[in-house]
């Protein structure tokens, strides 16, 4: 008896997936739970992939810095964020530069708090970002009860500083108290 090792449906889904990644020019993607070990491995793999593209060192540093902060802020497991579901992390490259995408399911209230922090960061110029960064570092040293909020805003400030761009975000309703929260950062 001959065993079927594949089906047309599987091949079609692979072809659809490949066409989608090619169309959007994704060079790196991951979907799953983000443990510390997974984050380390993702950073290592993405670094090798970007090195192979032979980009300028300044661009590599920007991308790597944004990646680290996205993975720490948006993707990693945190009880405070109100989610233990899979995260998604993507990098694409086109003629305009690189785009980093990160997202995960969150409780609605946490997503709205995160969007408020991003809106606050997006309104600041570079000097104001530096001032806010210093202020939050001082607050963090006091180990206040807003520890995770201060860590989050520090990561968002780093993303804005390194990319030199606004942080774009999207909140999509998924179910009762949950939303899918994603960010998109352009790096030139």
Walk through the language-model features, giving the residues of each.
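Helix-loop-beta hinge of the Bergerat
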Residues: 20-54, 122-134
């Amino acid at each position: 008896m001959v065993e079927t090792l594949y089906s047309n449906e599987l091949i079609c889904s692979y072809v659809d997936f490949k066409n989608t990644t090619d169309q959007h020019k994704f060079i790196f993607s991951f979907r799953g739970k983000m443990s510390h070990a997974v984050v380390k491995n993702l950073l290592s793999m993405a670094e090798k992939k970007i090195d192979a593209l032979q980009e300028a060192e300044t661009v590599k540093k920007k991308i790597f810095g944004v990646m680290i902060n996205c993975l720490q802020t948006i993707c990693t497991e945190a009880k405070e964020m109100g989610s233990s579901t899979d995260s998604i992390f993507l990098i694409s490259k086109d003629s305009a530069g690189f785009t980093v995408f990160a997202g995960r399911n969150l409780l609605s209230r946490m997503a709205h708090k995160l969007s408020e922090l991003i809106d606050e960061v997006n309104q600041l110029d570079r000097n104001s970002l530096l001032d806010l960064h210093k202020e939050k570092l001082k607050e963090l040293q006091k180990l206040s009860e807003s520890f995770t909020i201060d860590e989050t805003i520090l990561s968002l400030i780093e993303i804005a500083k390194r990319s030199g761009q606004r942080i774009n975000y999207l909140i999509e309703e998924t179910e009762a108290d949950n939303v899918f929260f994603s960010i998109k950062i352009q790096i030139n």
